[in-house]
Amino acid sequence: MPTINQLVSQGRKKKVWKTSSPALSLVYNSLNKKQTEIPAPFKRGVCTRVATMTPKKPNSALRKYARVKLSNGFEVTAYIPGEGHNIQEHSVVLIRGGRVKDLPGVRYTIVRGTQDAAGVANRNQSRSRYGTKKPKPKS
């Protein structure tokens, strides 16, 4: 507990808040070659590498990920959700924030069903998350 004199001389410090997805908060202006902080929910980018990665300990799998060069100049690692994908090198994708807990360094997720990333086939639950259209009713 600080004394009154300590509070008068220094005051209370505001807690510094750090974003968990920094690449979404910067915009690059190519005319004057400067970056400006304008937060955005999504960013577009081009895939430079598509590969698999093994998760941290107790889990075991081959998780699919892509290195994406964003429109603001950042290059980030993004997770490809769902079973099966059609993403290749030079595919244009949309990314959103959202880390994958068991993949170190993966802070972004690719949005399925937009740009070059197709939705997950034969998916009936949580369809909006995986960009799948509503199935036609069987008559």
UniProtKB/Swiss-Prot annotation:
Gene Ontology CC: small ribosomal subunit
One GO-annotated biological process of the protein: translation
Region (Disordered): 118-139
Residue ranges with Basic residues bias: 130-139
Pfam families: Ribosom_S12_S23
Cited SUPFAM superfamilies: Nucleic acid-binding proteins (SSF50249)
Biological role stated in the UniProt entry: With S4 and S5 plays an important role in translational accuracy. Interacts with and stabilizes bases of the 16S rRNA that are involved in tRNA selection in the A site and with the mRNA backbone. Located at the interface of the 30S and 50S subunits, it traverses the body of the 30S subunit contacting proteins on the other side and probably holding the rRNA structure together. The combined cluster of proteins S8, S12 and S17 appears to hold together the shoulder and platform of the 30S subunit.
Subunit structure: Part of the 30S ribosomal subunit. Contacts proteins S8 and S17. May interact with IF1 in the 30S initiation complex.
Recorded family membership: Belongs to the universal ribosomal protein uS12 family.
Protein name (Swiss-Prot/TrEMBL): Small ribosomal subunit protein uS12
Taxonomic source organism: Mycoplasma mobile (strain ATCC 43663 / 163K / NCTC 11711) (Mesomycoplasma mobile)
Lineage start: Bacteria, Bacillati, Mycoplasmatota, Mycoplasmoidales, Metamycoplasmataceae
